[in-house]
Amino acid sequence: MSDEKTHDQTDPLIGRLIDQRYRVTRRLARGGMATVYVAQDERLERPVALKVMHPHLAESDAFVERFHREARAAARIVHPGVVSVFDQGVVSGQGFLVMELIDGTNLRALLNAQGAFTIPRALRYTTDILEALRAAHRMGVIHRDIKPENILVPTDGPAKVADFGLARAVSEGSMFTTGNMLGTVAYIAPEIALTTEADARSDLYSVGIMLYEMLTGAVPWADESALQIASHHVSDDVPSPSATLPWIPREIDDLVAALTTRDPANRCADASDALDLVARAAASTPSDIANRRAEVAHEDSR
């Protein structure tokens, strides 16, 4: 029996009607900030994803206010590459979001299963993510926690970015949650590590780290501690993918460098600029390496 099915038998929310509308049917996943359930919207007769914040995040009225404010901001983003937010509320003192339920997986699961991607596939996901970020940034919404776990990959259609606003709701209260630096440290922009301040370029940095990982099969400095990794983000340039994979074209190295320049002033100015660079890199990829990918250990090879 899977862990989630076991939790279904003990979780008090399973079977409960939330807000006189959402019938919780099963637990989908548990993350650092919330537990995600599948629920049935009994009013509109459709399945939805119900994300319930962990209790320790709702210990102050200030957090609850920030949570609702950021949820409203996220709900304004209407784009095929952004997971839609339908509703919000409070259950047993814990804030919740009602979101679009995606039939598919996430980028982390795909990387775990396959190790690394070909250049065209990595650039396709990068394009999807940047197009979603462009829409959000134009609405004044910064994600702050771009990482593979927050990139959902449907069975059809573009990849979708999830959890807009949640990281900011937490970070305005504290840089730390349950002893860990907010935002997965492997993807954190230098300015967030230093000051917790972020803008659109901070999200682009995280996209650059994900692109590096999609190509090489690992994030930079993967074998070091969280504090050491944060220090590298602040003090060191992200290595070129070609340092690990000599066959990677220079245009890909240049793209990763443009996204991950430590000084935001010298980074890609916005998602539109980044998309132009991605298109150029895609057009310049030689056909004889288009199907190559890094040979790394992964679940499918075990």
Language-model-detected regions and their locations in the chain:
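Protein kinase glycine-rich loop
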Residues: 24-31, 36
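C-terminal lobe helix-coil module of Hanks-type protein kinase domains
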Residues: 186-285
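AlphaC helix of the eukaryotic protein kinase fold
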Residues: 54-76
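Activation-segment/catalytic-loop signature of the eukaryotic protein kinase fold
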Residues: 88
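Conserved short submotifs of the Hanks-type protein kinase catalytic core
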Residues: 92-106, 110
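Protein kinase catalytic-loop region centered on the HRD/HxD motif
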Residues: 129-141
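Activation segment signature within eukaryotic-like protein kinase domains
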Residues: 125-126
